[in-house]
Curated annotation (Swiss-Prot):
Ranges for the D repeats: 472-477, 478-483, 486-491, 493-498
Protein name as annotated: M protein, serotype 12
A Pfam family annotated for this UniProt entry: YSIRK_signal
Gene that specifies this protein: emm12
One of the GO BP terms on file: phagocytosis
Organism, as annotated: Streptococcus pyogenes
Coiled-coil regions, chain positions: 44-505
Role description: This protein is one of the different antigenic serotypes of protein M. Protein M is closely associated with virulence of the bacterium and can render the organism resistant to phagocytosis.
Length: 564
C-alpha cells in the first residue's frame, strides 16, 4: 500500500513537470511560428528555418498528443491498480523528447532569427507567466483531488476494519454458543445414563420382590404342611398357627406396600429426569436456532462487506469521472460521511442487539442452574425416602423373622409334647433346616438391598460431607447392632445355663411309658420329661426385653451379624 502511494505521488510530480514543459514548449513554438510568418521573404535562411520550425511544430504537436494520451490513461487505469513503474518510464521518455525538441528550438540559428525578427521577449515572458499560473492552478486542483482520494480511501479502510471486527466478533459468539451446546450435551449424557441405570435397578427390585414372594409362598406352604401334621393332636395350636400366618401375611402385605411406595418414589425421580431431559432438548433447539440466526447475521455482514466493496469501486469510478468538478467531489465526500455515520449507527444497533441476546442467554443459564439445584434437592429427598423405606423393610423383615421363630419354637414345643415320636422330631428338624435356609435367603436379600442402596447412593453422587455423615450413621447402626447381639448372646448363655439346670430335675408323670425300640433323644429348648401337657410348659423369657427366648433366632442373629 505504501509503495503504491509513493509511486502515485512520483507519477503526479512527473505529470506536473511534463505538463509544464509541454505548455512552455508549445508557447515558444507558437511564438516562433508567428515570427516565422512575418519574416521577410528575401531572407536566404528563412525557408530552411521555416521548414525546421514546421517540423518542430509537428513534433511538439505529437508530444502534446502523447502527454494527453498518457494523462487520460493515468485517469482510466488509476482505479484498476495501474503500474506506476510503467507510467514513470513513459514520462521519462516524454521528458527526454521534450528536452530534445526544446534544445532544437533554442539553437543558435533560432536565436539569430529571433534577434533579426525582433520578437517581444516581454510578451513571451508574460504569456509564460500566465501559463505557469494556469499550470499551478491545475496542480492545485490535482492536489485537492488527491486529498479527496486519500480521504475516501481512509473511509473505505475504516469501513473494512469495522466489518472485519464485526465478523470476528460474530465468529467468537458462534464459537461460544457451540461450546454451550457441547456442555449441555455433556450434562445430558450422564443424566440419560442415570435414568437408564434407575430403570434397571427398578426392574431388578421388581424381580427380587417376585422372588421373595415365591420363596415366602413356599415357606408358608411348608409351614402349613408341618402344622397340618401337628394339627391331629393340637387343634388349639393349629388355630394359633393360622392366626400367626394371617398376621405374617398382613405384615408381608404392608412390606409390599412400603416397597411399592419406594418404587413410586423411584418412578417419580425417573419422571423428573425425563422432564429435565426434555427441557435440555428444548434448550439445545433454542441454541441451535440462535446459531442459525448468527449464521444468517454473518452472511448478511459478508453481503454488506461485498456491498461496501462494490460501493468503493463505484466511488472510485465516480471520483475518476468527476475529478475536474470539485463541487461534485465534495458532495460525494458528504455522501460517504453520511454512509459512514449510518454504518456506525447500524453497528451500534447490532452491538446492542447482540448484547441483549447474550444477557438473555445468561438469564436462561441461571434459571437452568436453579432448576438443577432444585432437582438435586428433590433427588436428595427421594434418596432419604428410599433409605427410610429400606430401614422399614429391614425392620419388618426382622419382625417377621422373630415371629416365624416364635411360631417354630411353639411348634417344637408342641412336637416335643407328642411323647417323643420320631416322626415329629424329624419334622421339627426339617422345619429347623427350612427356617435356617429362609434366614439365609433373607440375609442374602438384605445384602442385595444394601447393595442396591449403595448403588443408588453412588448414582446420586453424594458430596464428601454427605458420605462422611452416611458413614457415621452406618457405624453407629453397626455398633448398636453389635451391642444388641452381645446382649442376646449373654441372654442365650443364661438360657442355656437355666436349661441345663432344668434338665437335671426331670418331672416324671405316671401313665406315659417309653416306646420300646425307639430312642428318645433330648431336644434343644425342651425338657427331658415328655409327660407334661404341651400348653402348660413353661416358656423362658429374656430378662432384658421379656420376649420368649429362641435359640434358633439367636443363632440366626449371630449369622446376620457375621454376614454384616
Amino acid at each position: 500500500m505504501a509503495k503504491n502511494t509513493t509511486n502515485r505521488h512520483y507519477s503526479l510530480r512527473k505529470l506536473k513537470t511534463g505538463t509544464a514543459s509541454v505548455a512552455v514548449a508549445l508557447t515558444v513554438v507558437g511564438a516562433g511560428l508567428v515570427a516565422g510568418q512575418t519574416v521577410r521573404a528575401d531572407h536566404s535562411d528563412l525557408v530552411a528555418e521555416k521548414q525546421r520550425l514546421e517540423d518542430l511544430g509537428q513534433k511538439f504537436e505529437r508530444l502534446k498528443q502523447r502527454s494527453e494520451l498518457y494523462l487520460q490513461q493515468y485517469y482510466d487505469n488509476k482505479s484498476n491498480g495501474y503500474k506506476g513503474d510503467w507510467y514513470v518510464q513513459q514520462l521519462k521518455m516524454l521528458n527526454r523528447d521534450l528536452e530534445q525538441a526544446y534544445n532544437e528550438l533554442s539553437g543558435e540559428a533560432h536565436k539569430d532569427a529571433l534577434g533579426k525578427l525582433g520578437i517581444d521577449n516581454a510578451d513571451l515572458k508574460a504569456k509564460i507567466t500566465e501559463l505557469e499560473k494556469s499550470v499551478e492552478e491545475k496542480n492545485d486542483v490535482l492536489s485537492q483531488i488527491k486529498k479527496e482520494l486519500e480521504e475516501a480511501e481512509k473511509d473505505i479502510q475504516f469501513g473494512r476494519e469495522v466489518h472485519a471486527a464485526d465478523l470476528l466478533r460474530h465468529k467468537q459468539e458462534i464459537a461460544e454458543k457451540e461450546n454451550v451446546i457441547s456442555k449441555l450435551n455433556g450434562e445430558l449424557q450422564p443424566l440419560k445414563q442415570k435414568v437408564d441405570e434407575t430403570d434397571r435397578n427398578l426392574q431388578q427390585e421388581k424381580q427380587k420382590v417376585l422372588s421373595l414372594e415365591q420363596q415366602l409362598a413356599v415357606t408358608k406352604e411348608n409351614a402349613k404342611k408341618d402344622f397340618e401334621l401337628a394339627a391331629l393332636g393340637h387343634q388349639l395350636a393349629d388355630k394359633e398357627y393360622n392366626a400367626k400366618i394371617a398376621e405374617l401375611e398382613s405384615k408381608l402385605a404392608d412390606a409390599k406396600k412400603d416397597f411399592e411406595l419406594a418404587a413410586l418414589g423411584h418412578q417419580h425421580a425417573h419422571n423428573e429426569y425425563q422432564a429435565k431431559l426434555a427441557e435440555k432438548d428444548g434448550q439445545i433447539k433454542q441454541l441451535e436456532e440462535q446459531k442459525q440466526i448468527l449464521d444468517a447475521s454473518r452472511k448478511g455482514t459478508a453481503r454488506d462487506l461485498e456491498a461496501v466493496r462494490q460501493a468503493k469501486k463505484a466511488t472510485e469510478a465516480e471520483l475518476n469521472n468527476l475529478k475536474a468538478e470539485l463541487a461534485k467531489v465534495t458532495e460525494q465526500k458528504q455522501i460517504l460521511d453520511a454512509s459512514r455515520k449510518g454504518t456506525a449507527r447500524d453497528l451500534e444497533a447490532v452491538r446492542k442487539s447482540k448484547k441483549q441476546q447474550v444477557e438473555a442467554a445468561l438469564k436462561q443459564l441461571e434459571e437452568q442452574n436453579k432448576i438443577s439445584e432444585a432437582s438435586r434437592k428433590g433427588l436428595r429427598r427421594d434418596l432419604d425416602t428410599s433409605r427410610e423405606a429400606k430401614k422399614q423393610v429391614e425392620k419388618d423383615l426382622a419382625n417377621l423373622t422373630a415371629e416365624l421363630d416364635k411360631v417354630k419354637e411353639e411348634k417344637q414345643i408342641s412336637d416335643a409334647s407328642r411323647q417323643g415320636l420320631r416322626r415329629d422330631l424329624d419334622a421339627s428338624r426339617e422345619a429347623k433346616k427350612q427356617v435356617e435356609k429362609a434366614l439365609e435367603e433373607a440375609n442374602s436379600k438384605l445384602a442385595a438391598l444394601e447393595k442396591l442402596n449403595k448403588d443408588l447412593e453412588e448414582s446420586k453422587k453424594l458430596t464428601e460431607k454427605e458420605k462422611a455423615e452416611l458413614q457415621a450413621k452406618l457405624e453407629a447402626e453397626a455398633k448398636a447392632l453389635k451391642e444388641q447381639l452381645a446382649k442376646q448372646a449373654e441372654e442365650l448363655a443364661k438360657l442355656r445355663a437355666g436349661k441345663a439346670s432344668d434338665s437335671q430335675t426331670p418331672d416324671a408323670k405316671p401313665g406315659n411309658k417309653a416306646v420300646p425300640g425307639k430312642g428318645q433323644a433330648p431336644q434343644a429348648g425342651t425338657k427331658p420329661n415328655q409327660n407334661k401337657a404341651p400348653m402348660k410348659e413353661t416358656k423362658r423369657q429374656l430378662p432384658s426385653t421379656g420376649e420368649t427366648a429362641n435359640p434358633f433366632f439367636t443363632a440366626a442373629a449371630l449369622t446376620v451379624m457375621a454376614a454384616a
